[in-house]
Amino acid sequence: MTQDYRVLLYYQYVPIEDGESFAQKHLSDCKALGLKGRILVADEGINGTVSGTVEQTNAYMSLMKNDSRFTSTIFKIDEAKQNAFKKMHVRYRPELVNLSLEDDVNPLELTGAYLDPKEFREAMLDENTVVIDARNDYEFDLGHFRGAIRPEIRSFRELPQWIRDNKEQFMEKRVLTYCTGGIRCEKFSGWLVREGFKDVGQLHGGIATYGKDPEVQGDLWYGQMYVFDSRIAVPINQKEHVIVGRDWFDGSPCERYINCGNPECNRQMLASKENEAKYLGACSHECRVHPDNRYIKAHQLSNQEVQERLALLEKDLAS
């Protein structure tokens, strides 16, 4: 059955003169088409995820292709049951992805070797290869390639320092890296080359492309792919589904992400509906008793109900 909506994921490193003005006009164009989504514009290019009807997304792709700067842009297309976003944002930023480098990497001049899904899969099976996930830790925890290294980072900009601290582990190995759609790896793989890594490859088109390849069919991917829209999780492996996510509270298999109820914390964590209720939607006791706990407010729990749940939880944890 054909779905009514689509989600488009894309990026393009290309010089954009006066990116701020471009972003303002692009927002107007997107709103005129009725699209929803989030697009970042920088002088170095564009990176976006938008959703809308088939007609709206087709019109957007035509709009982009009619601009000489974006004729080679590759759109990764997912069918969807509804819009993946509630609003339309186009924002200007100094750079598309932030590695916090004093001397930034220009992917148009320096980047790792592009590997298509089949080449990437074959390279992963080589015992002299290490695979580094270029995403954040919470993305990795939902799903990742078999044997991939999980950098202990909360954001992409922390990755270079983590590599410097751990480079002896894989300096002499062939290094592969991957991310959701490919944009982060363009810069990260180029930085690895600049740092002296001899053999660096990147998954061209990212995990999103790997999962749609008719031959590879997402093989060697465990879990689901984290996405930055209302879907949160997208299946990748067409051959088998292995759950790698673990519930924050009890370690059981889980693929349901929530944010900690304490708005000052907002930690993303995997949790079942049952555990979310049991732990009042919060990652710790301090967050559970926070006066602005969103879970308590959303469920209109009385102070008595909160105290009863806390008492039961304390008893359970003590046993």
Curated annotation (Swiss-Prot):
Its EC number is 1.14.-.-. GO terms for molecular function: oxidoreductase activity, acting on paired donors, with incorporation or reduction of molecular oxygen. Gene3D superfamilies: 3.30.70.100, Rhodanese-like domain. It catalyses: uridine(34) in tRNA + AH2 + O2 = 5-hydroxyuridine(34) in tRNA + A + H2O. GO terms for biological process: tRNA modification. InterPro entries: Rhodanese-like_dom (IPR001763), Rhodanese-like_dom_sf (IPR036873), Rhodanese_C (IPR022111), TrhO (IPR020936), TRHO_N (IPR040503). It holds the Pfam family Rhodanese_C. The active site is at C179. Residues 125-219 form the Rhodanese domain. CDD domains: RHOD_YceA (cd01518). Keywords: Oxidoreductase, tRNA processing. PROSITE patterns: RHODANESE_3. NCBIfam families: PRK00142.1-3 (NF001135). Catalyzes oxygen-dependent 5-hydroxyuridine (ho5U) modification at position 34 in tRNAs. Belongs to the TrhO family. This is tRNA uridine(34) hydroxylase.
